[in-house]
């Protein structure tokens, strides 16, 4: 028998009741089977479509096989590095149902990133897409805790298909509790070292009942499509938590979300809800193949990851007649806690708090700011907050302060009560919605034979979106020029995830520094 949560939406915020024995995967799947949606399509991916019944069987087989075939125990961890498609929800939910903790990770990283995450998490199993296997194959035997490498989309005895074939279609959910560890996501840190962000079973349904139903207005008959991938907290809600919470259908796309790829899915599947990020919205509007008004049937669009430029929002609304509901969420809070909403969209702001979450702004002295127009660090209190960073007590203590979670973002509240983004509290950059450490990019640049010193800052492009810009001091004997710029960009792309490379490189004689030798990035940002 399924153990389901119940939400009463006659109140604001809704009253959410979660039983003492509770498994998030059991809830998200079981509610749809009990509601008679077994024959309804839940996912459409690049290979075909799948019903709720088919998903339930795949999840049971996966949970059963992880526990019995591979011998995983409750709270053991499995790394999930899988391109968007049916294999992601199969593995993610299958692990959760079995009491195993899945760790969804970015599919765009490097071999060294993956080695760090495998070592840090001590995951016993990694499930990876066939396309990513060359990056993971060297890990077997190199990372001592890794026992099994399972290939999604592959063939043979190590494939996910072969593993599922060993599992049972009848599988009872592990007797987990709402506050048991459920899954991890990795969040970047100020030094570039990722942090394992630990979420519990009750977090998923809270995001659906507090944001997706009342703010976004998602409903059973909707088809939804998220350009943000499932390994992001934003994408996980968009393409997995929210559609399953209401019985909707989600479109999944494995390839990179270029304007052309997104246009094709929008035209073919005609989603009711589209989830994007500012960089993509700007690129789509600038593309000559952008759909015309009346070509799509969009009812709602959302944006997160970075602040949506006001001009982009207004141009999108003018073209399609539908607003973009810009908001802010985080890996730590799992999804959006501050948002514009239908009928109350103020472009250039992140809107107002989602009911069920409390926000405060704190100044540099630790005092709460109550005056409009004064910027401070945004802190959040809400039921979907992560409980810790794995194996990182210092940063856990610095971020999770009792009921409050620090965002690292600076905000101000304008005279009308809407929250306006005012930058990062540290030097971290948000590039296409993904945090980038300038220190990591600087280290890669300095590894080039021509570079003596490097400093990286955030710089606005023509759409007012932030991208990395590098200021370079060359070693004696090297000359500045376009050929070297091109070589440096390629060098960074070769060492780091491609989105981290500097879009602009400026050669300078020296870098501004403090008396103690610390680079003064604020002077470069205003240069």
From Swiss-Prot:
SUPFAM superfamilies: Acetyl-CoA synthetase-like
Activity response to pH changes: Optimum pH is 8.5.
Induction / repression: By benzoate and 2-aminobenzoate.
Molecular-function GO term, any one: ATP binding
InterPro entries referenced in this protein's UniProt entry, alphabetically: AMP-bd_C, AMP-bd_C_sf, AMP-dep_synth/lig_dom, Benz_CoA_lig
Assembly with partners or alone: Monomer.
Name of the featured protein: Benzoate--CoA ligase
Organism the protein comes from: Thauera aromatica
Gene: bclA
């Amino acid at each position: 028998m399924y153990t389901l949560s119940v939400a009463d939406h006659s109140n604001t915020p809704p009253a959410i009741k979660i039983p003492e024995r509770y498994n998030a995967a059991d809830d998200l799947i079981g509610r749809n089977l009990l509601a008679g949606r077994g024959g309804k399509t839940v996912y459409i991916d690049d290979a075909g479509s799948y019903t709720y019944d088919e998903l339930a069987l795949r999840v049971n087989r996966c949970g059963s096989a992880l526990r019995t075939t591979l011998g995983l125990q409750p709270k053991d961890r499995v790394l999930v590095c899988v391109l968007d498609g049916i294999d992601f929800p199969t593995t993610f939910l299958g692990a959760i149902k079995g009491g195993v903790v899945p760790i969804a990770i970015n599919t765009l990283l490097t071999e060294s990133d993956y080695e760090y995450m495998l070592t840090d998490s001590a995951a016993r199993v990694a499930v990876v897409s066939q396309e990513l296997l060359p990056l993971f194959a060297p890990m077997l035997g190199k990372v001592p805790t890794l026992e099994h490498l399972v290939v999604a989309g592959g063939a043979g005895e190590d494939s996910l298909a072969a593993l599922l074939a060993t599992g049972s279609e009848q599988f009872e959910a592990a007797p987990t509790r709402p506050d048991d560890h459920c899954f991890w996501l990795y969040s970047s840190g100020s030094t570039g070292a990722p942090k394992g962000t630990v979420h519990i079973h009750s977090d998923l349904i809270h995001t659906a009942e507090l944001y997706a139903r009342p703010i976004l207005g998602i409903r059973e008959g909707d088809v939804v499509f998220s350009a943000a991938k499932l390994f992001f907290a934003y994408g996980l809600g968009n393409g997995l938590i929210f559609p399953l919470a209401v019985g909707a259908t989600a479109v999944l796309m494995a390839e990179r979300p270029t304007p052309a790829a997104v246009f094709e899915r929008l035209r073919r599947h005609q989603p009711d809800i589209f989830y994007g990020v500012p960089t993509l919205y700007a690129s789509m509007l600038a593309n000559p193949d952008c759909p015309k008004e009346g070509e799509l049937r969009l009812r709602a669009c959302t944006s997160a990851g970075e602040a949506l430029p006001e001009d982009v929002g207004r141009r999108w609304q003018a073209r399609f007649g539908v607003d973009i509901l810009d908001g802010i969420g985080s890996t730590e809070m799992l999804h959006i806690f501050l948002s514009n909403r239908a009928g109350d969209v103020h472009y250039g702001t992140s809107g107002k708090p989602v009911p069920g979450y409390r926000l405060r702004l704190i100044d540099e002295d630790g005092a709460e700011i109550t005056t409009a127009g004064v910027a401070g660090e945004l802190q959040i209190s809400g039921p979907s907050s992560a409980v810790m960073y794995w194996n990182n007590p210092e940063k856990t203590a610095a971020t999770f302060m009792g009921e409050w979670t620090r965002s690292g973002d600076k905000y101000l509240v304008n005279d009308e009560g809407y929250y306006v983004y005012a930058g990062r509290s540290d030097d971290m950059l948000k590039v296409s919605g993904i945090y980038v450490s300038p220190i990591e990019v600087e280290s890669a640049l300095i590894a080039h034979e021509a570079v003596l010193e490097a400093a990286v800052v955030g710089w606005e492009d023509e759409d007012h979106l932030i991208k990395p810009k590098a200021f370079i001091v060359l070693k004696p004997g090297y000359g500045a020029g376009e050929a070297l710029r091109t070589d440096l960009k390629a060098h960074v792309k070769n060492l780091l995830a491609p989105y981290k490379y500097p879009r602009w490189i400026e050669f300078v004689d020296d870098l501004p520094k403090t008396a103690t030798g610390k680079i003064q990035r604020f002077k470069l940002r205003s240069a």
